[in-house]
């Protein structure tokens, strides 16, 4: 055990006669690169624990289990190719390491507790199709945005995907989308706050877990959805259907008086049935003042409706439009000038 503990070595050649690497063999050493030969059939726990200079490791192709704490706190280890026969990743295996990208092998069945905990640079990962178990806190404190749980998963531990950072004393969840394929209900205290949760059509969510998600899609459909853009764009990781969508945008650029100015571009992934204007409130009740593009018949039938400018970008140039259709680019200008009376 601990054969090269704390040694100042950059590389090391393991002879072909070696069949076992004992517990903690290289931990706290300064090793940078190492190839483990195919003759090695047993690797014990904490082999490279706290090897802060380690950047490259080649593992034997016949390896089926990654030992516990093998690369714990290897801060310079950014990626590693795992053997295709690997079925289990041990507890704390990559905890607090520098891993930022990894392809999990298709045969992987078990990810033990705390396996990737604290890998703050890890933003995405694809779970393989035969995975059965994800241990508690396995991906906690990572930067994962979107995750899909395979239907084969039968066990998932608490806080497994509490993907947040706690810098400066505040907690920010990185998780945006969760796709849940198992037939059993989405459990409580597994995921950090997320915007979208996709479950099977007949799927269920633990009652105290529902509040963790802004929108829940059953069979890809949700009853109502609100989109508010503080910036210039929004994104959704997976195709969705909503029975009703409310889209809010604040137009504060000053226009001309009775003439357009301060144009904005807009592209929406859905047709727009109704436009309304509210000066302060953004409640989803569609009770604001009705709006319509110049040329829309609503301006002729509703005396309370207010006009705005709308042009579609076509292959031959901008053309005046009376409605917004899905996935088409438009220029839009809302009358916004102090010379207008307040609405």
Segments predicted by a language model, with ranges:
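Intrinsically disordered, low-complexity segments enriched in small/polar residues
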Residues: 1, 22, 88, 96, ...
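Consensus positions within tandem repeat domains that build extended binding/scaffold surfaces
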Residues: 1-5, 22-25, 44-49, 67-72, ...
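Extracellular/lumenal glycan-associated surfaces
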Residues: 49, 117, 162-163, 327-335
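Structural signature of tandem-repeat unit edges
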Residues: 7-20, 29-42, 52-65, 75-88, ...
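A structural signal for leucine-rich repeat
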Residues: 189-192, 210
């Amino acid at each position: 055990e601990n054969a090269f503990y704390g040694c100042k070595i950059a590389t090391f050649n393991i002879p072909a006669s070696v069949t076992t690497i004992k517990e903690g063999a290289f931990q706290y050493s300064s090793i940078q690169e190492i190839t483990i030969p195919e003759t090695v059939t047993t690797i014990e726990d904490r082999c490279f624990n706290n090897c802060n200079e380690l950047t490259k490791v080649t593992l034997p192709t016949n390896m089926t289990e990654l030992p516990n704490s093998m690369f714990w706190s290897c801060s310079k280890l950014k990626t590693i190719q795992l053997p295709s026969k690997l079925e289990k990743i041990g507890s704390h295996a990559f905890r607090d390491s520098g891993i930022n990208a990894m392809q999990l092998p298709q045969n992987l069945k078990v990810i033990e507790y705390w396996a990737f905990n604290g890998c703050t640079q890890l933003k995405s990962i694809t779970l393989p199709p035969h995975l059965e178990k994800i241990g508690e806190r396995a991906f906690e404190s990572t930067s994962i945005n979107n995750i899909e749980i395979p239907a084969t998963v039968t066990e998932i531990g608490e806080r497994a995907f509490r993907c947040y950072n706690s810098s400066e004393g505040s907690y920010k969840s990185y998780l945006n989308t969760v796709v849940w394929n198992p037939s059993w209900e989405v459990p409580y205290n597994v995921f950090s706050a997320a915007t979208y949760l996709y479950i099977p059509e007949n799927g269920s969510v633990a009652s105290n877990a529902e509040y963790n998600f802004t929108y829940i899609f059953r069979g890809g459909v949700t009853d109502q959805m609100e989109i508010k853009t503080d910036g210039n764009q929004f994104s959704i990781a997976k195709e969705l259907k909503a029975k009703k969508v409310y889209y809010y945008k604040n137009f504060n650029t000053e226009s001309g008086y009775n003439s357009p100015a301060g144009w904005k571009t807009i592209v929406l992934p859905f047709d727009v049935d109704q436009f309304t204007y509210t000066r302060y409130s953004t409640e989803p009740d569609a009770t604001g003042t009705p709006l319509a593009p110049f040329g829309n018949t609503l301006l002729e039938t509703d005396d309370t409706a207010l006009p705005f400018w709308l042009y579609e970008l076509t292959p031959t140039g901008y053309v005046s439009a009376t409605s917004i259709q899905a996935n088409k680019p438009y220029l839009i200008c809302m009358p916004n000038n102090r010379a207008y009376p307040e609405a």
